[in-house]
UniProtKB/Swiss-Prot annotation:
The lineage of its organism: Bacteria, Pseudomonadati, Chlamydiota, Chlamydiia, Chlamydiales. This is Malate dehydrogenase. Substrate binds at residues 93, 99, 132, 163. GO terms for molecular function: L-malate dehydrogenase (NAD+) activity. HAMAP family: Malate_dehydrog_2 (MF_01517). Keywords: NAD, Oxidoreductase, Tricarboxylic acid cycle. The active site is at 188 (proton acceptor). It is an enzyme of class 1 (oxidoreductase). Its EC number is 1.1.1.37.
Length: 326
């Protein structure tokens, strides 16, 4: 039985990530099995026929939670009065395409979307950004939507967290459920910081199970950092199904939190407990509070290895920010 209904917008509605994500969303994986969904699916003009096909499949899925499905090429209609937006649509990264090549094109897209959110979305709407370069795109959208709460903008780092989680599980030969406190800091890029020093295996420090520090620093970390490029090289396209799953999990950690769960998210750095510059979107370890708000987990120690990686990632975010104009 539906106890409430949320209004949700998904951009890039005809793309690969959205195609996987929409069915997870409709099933209740994000907001729960008792929450109805008023769904608006947006894509750019010229995609109307493909959008209609997506709607047909959602109708054919007979999802009880879908109260309404609207497909549109109008950002105003998509964002009008929404409680949450999943900004998936962007120019994709292909083989040989670097992040800097995406900044200008996608910056314009997210500036436009931020302005539309500012005009039409609810002030407390939560905004989840997926399109790369995701930290900077999220920052652009946030700064073009000053009416909305800055703390409610999230850049997706959950895919990086999941990649690290899986690698640690395989190396330790334990179930995924035995690995906790998996943390990714900084930028969603090849300069992200997969912080194994915080991780626990069976509630014990990771070093008790994986004692090979060289493997952690020189195999695991660069493998997680470069996994997106490896997927593109192998299949000729960027991650889609795994990204959609990570997006659903990222939002579920906020809307349906597990007690004590840590999750990595790119959030506004204003007033952060680590003394990092303000007005950035930076990946932090977070957890939900009883108030329904998240907090950046404070007072986590950084050893020399992690501190050095943190500075590299911070420098990249600052460089990206400096390269775009609002």
């Amino acid at each position: 039985m539906v106890s409430q209904t949320v209004s949700v917008a998904v951009t890039g509605g005809t793309g690969q990530i959205a195609y996987s994500f929409l069915f997870s969303l409709a099933h209740g994986d994000v907001f729960g099995l008792d929450c109805g969904i008023d769904l608006r699916i947006y894509d750019i003009p010229g995609t109307e026929r493909a959008l209609s096909g997506v709607r047909m499949e959602l109708d054919d899925g007979a999802f009880p939670l879908l109260q309404r499905v609207q497909v549109t090429t109008s950002l105003h209609d998509a964002f009008d009065g929404i409680d949450a937006a999943f900004l998936i649509g962007s120019v994709p990264r292909g083989p040989g395409v670097e992040r800097r090549d995406l900044l200008k094109k996608n910056g314009e897209i997210f500036a436009t979307q931020g302005k539309a959110l500012n005009t039409t979305a609810k002030r407390d709407a939560k905004i989840f950004v997926v399109g790369n370069p995701v930290n900077t795109n999220c920052w652009i959208a946030m700064n073009h939507a000053p009416r909305l709460l800055r703390k409610n903008f999230h850049a997706m780092l959950r895919l990086d967290q999941n990649r690290m989680h899986s690698m640690l599980s395989h190396r330790a030969e334990v179930p995924l459920s035995a690995v906790s406190q998996v943390v990714v800091w900084g930028n969603h890029s090849a300069k992200q910081v997969p912080d194994f020093t915080q991780a626990l295996i069976n509630d014990r420090p990771i070093a008790e199970t994986i004692a090979d520090r060289d493997w952690l620093e020189n195999i695991m970390v660069p493998s997680v950092q470069s996994r997106g490029s490896a997927v593109i090289e192998a299949r000729g396209k960027s991650s889609a199904a795994s990204a959609a799953r990570a997006l659903a999990e990222a939002a579920r950690s906020i809307y349906q939190p597990k007690e004590g769960e840590w999750f990595s998210s790119g959030v506004c750095s204003d007033h952060n407990p680590y003394g990092l510059p303000e007005d950035l979107i930076f990946g932090f370890p977070c957890r939900m509070l009883a108030t329904g708000e998240y907090e950046v987990i404070p007072r986590l120690p950084w050893d020399a290895f992690i501190r050095g990686k943190m500075q590299i990632s911070l420098d990249e975010i600052l460089q990206e920010k400096a390269s775009v104009s609002l």
